[in-house]
């Protein structure tokens, strides 16, 4: 039997999904020892799994190891809600699973740049239609805008010339005697 706090928490999670068009869930805090196969078998108890994405590290020291979360699409909303109610907070090996409605990440433009051209600012309607990566045309516009800014303000972008060679100061001091190995004392 669930406590009142767990019931309220699950109710708030379920109500958050009412605006969802799909039936996609995010499952997090997955123990690294749980395999993709075992997770799919666990999820199939709640309904027909339409799509399952188990994420792995692509590079770095943890390359090939699970990221600790996955996404799952169920065929119906009821199946997804039942999975949230049953799996959220459930202990799986050594960790409690966290199950939530999945939501798309919003593109947050870099605000640190002073003079970003208006052509690169994503509008709210375009941000939903475009994929997360910039198109080739947008990249070309960005490079052209940067070149134009560099032409207008050459002082802002001047740096050391690529062909500058700083010659070391001429040392005219010479040894009074040439270096000989037998002058060195043996150190060990």
Curated annotation (Swiss-Prot):
Keywords: RNA-binding. Residues 23-104 form the RRM domain. This is Probable RNA-binding protein 18. Pfam families: RRM_1 (PF00076). It comes from Danio rerio. InterPro entries: Nucleotide-bd_a/b_plait_sf (IPR012677), RBD_domain_sf (IPR035979), RBM18_RRM (IPR039157), RRM_dom (IPR000504). The keyword Hydrolase does not apply. The lineage of its organism: Eukaryota, Metazoa, Chordata, Craniata, Vertebrata. One of its GO terms (molecular function) is RNA binding.
């Amino acid at each position: 039997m669930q406590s009142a706090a767990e019931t309220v928490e699950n109710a708030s999670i379920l109500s958050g999904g009412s605006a969802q068009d799909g039936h996609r869930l995010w499952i997090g805090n997955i123990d690294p020892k749980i395999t993709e196969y075992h997770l799919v078998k666990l999820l199939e108890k709640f309904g027909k799994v339409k799509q399952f994405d188990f994420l792995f590290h692509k590079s770095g020291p943890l390359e090939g190891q699970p990221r600790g979360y996955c996404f799952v699409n169920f065929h119906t909303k009821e199946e997804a809600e039942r999975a949230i109610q049953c799996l959220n907070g459930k202990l799986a090996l050594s960790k409690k699973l966290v199950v939530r409605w999945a939501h798309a990440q919003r593109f947050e433009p870099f605000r640190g740049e002073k003079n970003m051209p208006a052509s690169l600012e994503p509008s709210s309607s375009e941000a939903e239609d475009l994929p997360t990566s910039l198109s080739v045309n947008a990249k070309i516009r960005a490079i052209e805008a940067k070149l134009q800014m560099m032409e207008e303000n050459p002082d802002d972008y001047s740096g050391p010339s690529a062909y500058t060679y700083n010659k070391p100061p001429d040392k005219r001091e010479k040894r009074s005697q040439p270096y000989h190995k037998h002058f060195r004392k043996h150190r060990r």
